[in-house]
């Protein structure tokens, strides 16, 4: 949906605590007569200045080609939004994902008519503006409803960007169908899962998912079958089935209501039938899609979603199948959902998580017990080795004592003797012993030291020259014998049987 320029707020909600002036806004510009002016030449300004001298700032709004150009466009809603629980939530604000889809636009319109504020997530803000302008022009939406409509750009890309687009909404609705991402594009189960994950990030309290079962029906067209086959073959990931979607939604922390149905147009005969809500797997639900009588018009499913958001307690964590029946009476939403049991997938998942956590804790405890047992066993081995070493040391000491006793010497005695030797040994005593030994080894001096009295008497004697007596030489002193030269020795031997004699003479070189 889109709005007129005066009633379609496309900017983000103002921060809390900001006060607004309720008086009519007026544009006041203080400028001199020589200030710049728009759209006029200097000559024209001079000619008109005489007539309108009090209004120097001229601007002709009638020459604007389209008032739509004055509407601010939010190209990046993430810059003005804070996702998560940091922003104060509004219990009366609902985020409609795919608000320009065939069912999404009817859901947004019905919610506005019921008094809710709507944040419309759209893939194209320009198209949403056109729709809002048409709705306001033809009175499809009242001025009050248009004021409560806030469109934000929100393609199905990632959960973080969708969470920022959700903003202060406390409830979220998304429709899975072939014409729900705009008027002719598909919203898949994977896209719906992204919306649920974004709702969990944004702190949303309740999510409603409308699943149109006609998207999986056969068109009996060969080209469509070939296109679907090759599309699934070359796709990066296979699309989620509705069962997989419910399983993953049950694993989140957001309360949910999943509606399985087969949608039809509002001008079909089913618009006069009443809605029937049955439990999942019932034959009276949308499973009998072959019968045209059981389909649900889009306006009726939008009315059911609005009733659910008005009383979410009766529809929390339930998966239902919705159809129409001409013979069914009209019932309020609390009667329709009170007989539906709560979906058991979340409880099964919670039990599985608790069981897995208990098994993990038991495994950790078993590992710790095993490690403690191994540590105790290793400690016992170390203690056993230590006791064996102590016994071996004791036996060696006993053998040494026995050997010492055998030779008559005890170990204590040896230690005592060693102590005595070490105590009696000193460097001073050892030095004096060496000095005494050296003095005893020296010869006794020939000159005797006189007594004190003798020394005094010797000092008084006059000095005399010492006379040395020389021994007279004897004339008969024997002369040293001169050595006679040795005669050369001869050696004679007989040769040739005594016929000849050979004489060998040895002469000294001296």
Swiss-Prot record:
Self-association and partners: Component of the plastid transcriptionally active chromosome required for plastid gene expression. Interacts with DEGP1 under high light conditions and maybe its degradation target.
Domain of life where this protein originates: Eukaryota
Phosphothreonine occurs at 451
Q: What is this protein called?
A: Protein PLASTID TRANSCRIPTIONALLY ACTIVE 16, chloroplastic
Bias category Basic and acidic residues: which stretches? 41-51, 479-493
Kindly list the biological process annotations in GO that this record carries. Answer: circadian rhythm
Keyword Membrane included in the entry's annotation:
yes
InterPro entries membership: NAD(P)-bd_dom, NAD(P)-bd_dom_sf
Query: Which family does the record assign?
Result: Belongs to the NAD(P)-dependent epimerase/dehydratase family.
Pfam families recorded for this chain? NAD_binding_10 (PF13460)
Q: Where is this chain's protein located in or outside the cell?
A: Plastid, Chloroplast stroma, Chloroplast nucleoid; Plastid, Chloroplast thylakoid membrane
Q: Where is the transit peptide?
A: 1-19
Q: How does it sit in the membrane?
A: Peripheral membrane protein
Describe the function of this protein.
Probably involved in the regulation of plastid gene expression.
The gene for this chain is PTAC16
According to the UniProt entry, the coiled-coil residues are 354-403
Q: What is its main location?
A: plastid
Keyword set for this entry? Chloroplast, Coiled coil, Membrane, NADP, Phosphoprotein, Plastid, Thylakoid, Transit peptide
Question: Cellular component GO terms, alphabetically?
Answer: chloroplast; chloroplast envelope; chloroplast nucleoid; chloroplast thylakoid; chloroplast thylakoid membrane; cytosol; stromal side of plastid thylakoid membrane
* Keyword DNA-binding appears in the UniProt entry: no
**Which residues does the annotation say bind NADP(+)?**
94-123
- PTM (free text): Excluded from chloroplast nucleoid when phosphorylated on Thr-451 by STN7 that may regulate membrane-anchoring functions of the nucleoid.
Knockout phenotype, as recorded, reads: No visible phenotype and normal nucleoids.
Phosphoserine occurs at: 395
Region listing for Disordered, in residue ranges: 1-24, 38-58, 453-493
Q: Supply the SUPFAM superfamilies for this chain.
A: NAD(P)-binding Rossmann-fold domains
Q: Where is the composition biased (Polar residues)?
A: 1-14
